[in-house]
């Protein structure tokens, strides 16, 4: 070590060390998340979450390793550490020695070794039949008509598939129009598009309650009618899960066009990632039409339907047929690394959105990666328009495999042959909570987000409100519920989906009994966590964007200041999407959690009955 520094960059012990080999120079490596056990003498024992390997290091070394959670080359880690820790400036050889020692100990994750483990495994391509397509609609017959026209043009209706229109319309006239659309479309295109509206739903609900009287309350909550002022997005999706049980299921929102739109720059690579989607911005509403894929117009063919249920090596063979290069791990969080195994299966497939991304907030525009945000702020006039107009390509440029299901698209594939949870039938963010619950039931399950999009063009013009990004995060019921479940996921030792589904019901019964004080504490904790996370991310983005135009930098600084100011104000005491005063909101939340728990207890029996009796 150089004598000018007191930084203790050395080891005390190495336990279970591997042979003395350095990582290949082209490899990408990252420090494994470790359990840390403080010792005396400024030392800490580490045990790797992924490898189970152990070592003892000085606390200074541990601090340095905490800077190595991103997958980078050895040289990139070295340069980053010298920049992040001034005491290490000029100590290239010492840094390399320590990182190589950590690699030999088994606590550095290797992209090359993982890629070898996940080598593609060729599999027979399945015919795109035996699928269940469910269109979900509510009081939008014009949108349904437009969607069906695009399906007639771009989709091959195979006799082995089943097709449903699940109608949640409240107005009788719209119900009649949708039923007529199904009948006329079926006649004209020689396909059985089944209308599944209030009458059909009521019929099946009655039969379910008669067959399963002990679960009557749970069935009514998940599948029954609610007051007209309630948003029941999840209710329609529960009917889709039941109709599609035992099949590959495709969920389609009514306000999309059934066609495939490619990104301007499309890759043929696959990646394992923890990152969010890319964004591309357009100056006019119809520019995307030049990106339509005329040769493969159906967004649900190829890997979208074919990858459902496949193991990761099989899905890689289907997507690209090539072994993952080290760069494919660049955006992977080490915490997710161990979830990508040969036995991991794709349970969810999705594609991006062209037009309206479907998000109520636009704060994520300031959290985009470098390439996307450069496109965002390239022109001031267009930048100002992008803050309000929902007209962008939002998706992937690669075949992106994820172990998180935080964003599910307007066209979603679900492997309903597996045990799945029901959606929460009320409120928004039903897909966010569903994704977290799928991950809870199947910890090694994957989502494949595909490198194309479908046009999402609501008939009504939607715009983001001015100043929306400056508003501090506030929880709705289901986003908060997803947060609470995420904290429990790693602590459940059960290995079977059935047992984990039972524990889900217990989890929501426990939430239903939470005290006011504890609920207020958790609301404050999650709000502060989101706010401070946004502040950190935006501050880092601002620091790494000195070349960005002043108008964007000023706006980003104003958002950071607004979020910092919100830290001095009282935390929310209720839920933004439940009416009433905060006490009423908390009481309502507890009642809804209790009702959902009864539904979770009923769900497995409902699914089994529907498969036998539909």
Q: Language-model features: where?
A:
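Short, acidic, metal-binding catalytic loop of nucleotide-sugar glycosyltransferases
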Residues: 149-160, 184-185
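Extended catalytic-interface subdomain
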Residues: 272-406, 410
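Active-site-proximal specificity loops/subdomain of glycosyltransferases
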Residues: 176-247, 264
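Long, charge-rich, low-complexity alpha-helical segments
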Residues: 2-7, 42, 50-127
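Acidic, low-complexity/disordered tracts enriched in E/D and polar residues
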Residues: 1-67, 604
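Long, compositionally biased intrinsically disordered regions
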Residues: 27-30, 34-39, 107-120, 124-125, ...
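A conserved hydrophobic helix/loop-capping motif in glycosyltransferases and polysaccharide synthases
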Residues: 132-140, 154, 166-168
């Amino acid at each position: 070590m150089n004598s000018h520094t007191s930084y203790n960059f050395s080891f005390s012990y190495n336990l279970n060390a591997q042979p003395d080999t350095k990582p290949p120079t082209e490899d990408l490596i990252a420090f494994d998340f470790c359990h840390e056990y403080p010792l005396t003498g400024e030392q800490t024992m580490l045990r790797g979450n992924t490898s189970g390997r152990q070592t003892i290091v000085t606390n200074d070394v541990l601090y340095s390793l905490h800077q190595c959670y991103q997958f980078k080359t050895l040289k990139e880690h070295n340069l980053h550490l010298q920049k992040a820790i001034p005491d290490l400036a000029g100590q290239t050889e010492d840094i390399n020695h320590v990182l190589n020692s950590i690699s030999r100990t088994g606590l550095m994750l290797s992209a090359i070794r993982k890629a070898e483990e996940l080598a593609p495994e060729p599999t027979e391509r399945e015919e795109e039949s035996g699928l269940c397509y469910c269109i979900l609609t509510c009081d939008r017959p014009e949108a349904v008509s437009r969607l069906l026209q695009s399906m007639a043009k771009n989709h091959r209706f195979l006799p082995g598939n089943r097709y449903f229109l699940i109608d949640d319309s409240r107005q009788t006239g719209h119900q009649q129009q949708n039923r007529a659309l199904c009948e006329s479309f079926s006649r004209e295109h020689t396909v059985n598009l089944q209308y599944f509206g209030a009458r059909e739903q009521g019929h099946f609900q009655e039969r379910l309650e008669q067959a399963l009287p002990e679960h009557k309350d749970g069935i009514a909550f998940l599948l029954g009618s609610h007051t007209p002022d309630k948003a029941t997005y999840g209710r329609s999706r529960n009917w889709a899960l039941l109709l599609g049980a035992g099949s590959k299921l495709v969920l389609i929102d009514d306000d999309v066009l059934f066609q495939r739109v490619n990104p301007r720059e499309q890759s043929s690579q696959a990646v394992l990632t923890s990152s969010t989607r890319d964004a591309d911005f357009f100056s006019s509403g119809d520019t995307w039409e030049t990106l339509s894929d005329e040769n493969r117009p159906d967004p649900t063919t190829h890997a979208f339907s074919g990858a459902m249920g496949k193991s990761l090596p099989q899905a890689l063979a289907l997507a690209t047929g090539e072994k993952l290069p080290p760069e494919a791990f660049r955006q992977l969080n080490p915490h997710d690394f161990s979830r990508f195994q040969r036995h991991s299966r794709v349970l969810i497939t999705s594609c991006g959105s062209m037009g309206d991304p479907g998000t109520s907030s636009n704060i994520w525009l300031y959290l985009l990666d470098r390439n996307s945000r450069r496109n965002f702020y390239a022109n001031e006039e267009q930048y100002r328009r992008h803050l309000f107009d929902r007209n962008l390509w939002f998706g992937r440029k690669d075949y992106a495999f994820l172990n998180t299901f935080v964003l599910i698209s307007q066209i979603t594939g679900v492997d309903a042959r597996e045990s799945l949870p029901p959606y929460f039938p009320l409120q928004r963010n039903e897909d966010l909570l569903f994704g977290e619950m799928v991950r809870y039931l199947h910890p090694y399950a994957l989502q494949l987000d595909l490198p194309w999009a479908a046009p999402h063009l609501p008939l009504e013009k939607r715009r983001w409100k001015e100043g929306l990004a400056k508003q501090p995060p506030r929880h709705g019921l289901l986003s908060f519920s997803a947060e609470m479940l995420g904290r429990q996921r790693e602590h459940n030792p059960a290995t079977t989906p059935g047992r984990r589904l039972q524990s889900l019901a217990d989890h929501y019964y426990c939430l239903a009994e939470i005290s006011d004080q504890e609920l207020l504490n958790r609301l404050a904790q999650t709000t502060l966590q989101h706010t401070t996370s946004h502040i950190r991310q935006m501050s880092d983005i601002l620091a790494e964007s000195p070349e960005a135009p002043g108008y964007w930098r000023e706006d980003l600084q104003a958002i950071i200041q607004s979020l910092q100011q919100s830290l001095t104000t009282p935390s929310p005491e209720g839920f933004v999407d439940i009416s009433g005063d905060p006490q009423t909101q908390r009481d309502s939340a507890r009642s809804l959690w209790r009702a959902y728990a009864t539904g979770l207890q009923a769900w497995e029996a409902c699914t089994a009955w529907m498969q036998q009796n539909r």
